[in-house]
Amino acid sequence: MCRTPRGGKTPHRVRGEATVSSREGRTMRRWLVALALAGTATVALGGCVQPHRADGDLIDDWPPLSAPRLFVPATDACLPRITPVVQAGTYETVECARSHLAEAVHVGMFTGATAGGTRPEPGSPALRTARAECDQRAREAIGGDWHAARLTLNIALPSVTGWLSGARWYRCDLSETDSIDNTRPVNRVGSLRGALVSDNPLVHRCFDPKLIGNNLNYMAPVLCTEPHRAEFVGVYVERDMSWAVFTRSSQQVHRRCMGLIAAFADVPNNSDLPYRAGSIFYPPSQREWEEGDRGVRCFLWSDDRRLTRSMRGVGPKGLPAI
């Protein structure tokens, strides 16, 4: 049974500026005032003492001004708040051992045409290259696909002022979420690095879906040894298409998920498969989709019997066609 309404829900997603503080500039102004006063004194004493001739170059002995340094946020840092735009004046990090909302797993740089134009807007297709890089860096940091866990990935950008001043960075922020249905980031303690290398409660496993009529209300996580009707089987990457086309492609998504279910349970992907299980799927939000996220989460769905074990590798006898 294809539970396409699971994909119809759009959960809430929460997703810098250059400052130049020049002490040299203030010192320079003092020196200019001092030189002006010295010149006045020289003129006043001109009738009495032969003035010392200047060398003609008023600035040859001044230290050169250092180039303005653009603000770039730190990577491998944890953040007490999440904002799609980072202001240098309000930028703040905390130790990952303390409570925080996100972890910056990478800071990259825009290049090419994107870097030469106006600043990309959050949720725009101009962020596709950045999101692809963020996705790969997140995988490297946590040891697996973040879609397979209670995690969400957001991109932070410089302010428009920072962009106009030359900032071309983007930051990849990874956060723990409350559940697969509520993807609002929640506070956590500890770094996410290596989180998916070993067994971790963040990873999606078994669920007992709660329905209202034929529509999914939410997915309650349970132990796989407890009675349940759904289990996470994996993620597939959807082909490139518009959001409008994707929302009309539930049957195609269902077929792709059924292929993952067959591989997960080690059963044939044939005409008997719909009599063994159905699918539930969670796509990216529209904003994530527009930025280039194509990861669709797939779940095995057992609508006619409760399961009390994982269906991973059970074969045709463990997941019979009925």
Annotate each PLM feature.
Residues 7-8, 16, 25, 39, ...:
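Residue-identity detector for glycine
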Residues 21-38:
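N-terminal export and membrane-targeting signals
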